[in-house]
Amino acid sequence: MTDKKAQPEKSICTCNDTAETLASVGDVIDKFLHRVLDVEECAKSFIDDARKNYNENADRLRLEASKCIDIIRNEEDSDQKLYGIRQLRRCEREIDRHNNSSPVTTLEKSLFISLFASFDSFIGDLISVLYQTKAELYKNISKEIPLSEVLTFSSIDELRQHMLCEEIESLRRKSYYDQFKDLENRFSITLTQFENWPSFIECSQRRNLYTHCDGIVSKQYLTICNKVGYAFQEEPKIGDELKIGGKYFFQACHIISVVAVMLGQTLWRKILPAKIEQADTHLSRVIFDFLHMEQWQRSISISKFVLGLPKISTDEMERIFHVNYAIALKAIGKSKAAINVLDRKDWSATSNDFKLAYAVLNEEYKKAKSIMEKIGGQGDLISEIAYHDWPLFRDFRYQQEFFDGYESVYGYKYCVKLSSIVEEKKAEVESTENDDAQ
């Protein structure tokens, strides 16, 4: 389920390499989440291709080498033998290059490092937007600056921006462990007491190994991982080489995404408590978007964080969070856990929209059909497009009760409207393609 988006005011962040308009902490989080999704898409698109090309090249070289050897052994013509020898030497050089190449590993390392480069940018954007939204925070910057340098600035605003950029760069030079501790002290809040904190720090330390040591385990890596309580399946030794692999890579993407959401939201709520409704709306949309992408574990992790928050803006929003959490749990086969989440709240006095959600998730499809008819064409939250689009109805859309209820409410079959929507979207795509071609 989702709610209407808030429309925050604009502010300018200029501490990164390029100036860019960022409306709120929500925009900062969204920008980072899209970068992580970009990295994941690159991994899915190019790593398999690199592995396939590597193996195909190996097969080609083996075949060429075999042909050259046959020519040398069997050909009586001296010119042909000489040609075979030259070709074999060329092939041997290609084989040597092939055997010393590692395109898959190179791509994995590059994309993994890119994750944390984006996180560095996220930290800068986050601090910048918070300071620019709440100007009193500038008073906490205690850096000294010579008068001669002060006089080079044309305005107080320019000076403040310079000081903020210096503060952000100083923070970025620290390890992530020290960055989080700095932010805890700066804003008087706990930021490291969450389940994936040790895993996040291990990932960040592994990034350092790939950046500086080609993945070779160092004493510092082991010391810091043990300091935060990271549980190794089998603790490596100094000098061992750490691999990445698909499972670890995508788990790192999951962890860093969730950490960014939690960090951004926690500071947003602490520093700008009056914006809690805006923060909740953003969180609801993030979870809703991950549900649409069928990123169930990401939805679950963020939902756990949300329902552990000390305050949620409205009862309606809290119920939306419960419903979306249950949707994700049900999608991974944890139907009983999903109902347990819903049963934390009393739904008897709620709107029909929420009663429909409960019935659907509890697979009470006859009851759900009846509630659909009570809601009619437009509910408090549910509209016609919701039946086509919302993850809540993902399984219900295959049930006869859904088809009957939909036709009863709207006067035409679900598949007729679905075909109409498909044609509209097709026309939109074609229109966009035509505009791009002009």
Task: Show which residues each predicted segment covers.
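Helix-loop junctions and short alpha-helical segments
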Residues: 70-201, 206, 219, 223-224, ...
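Generic helix N-cap/helix-start motif at coil->alpha-helix transitions
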Residues: 275-285, 313-323, 345-354, 382-386
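Charge-enriched, short contiguous segments at helix-coil
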Residues: 185-257, 266-269
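Residue-level signature for tetratricopeptide repeat
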Residues: 289, 328, 358-361, 395
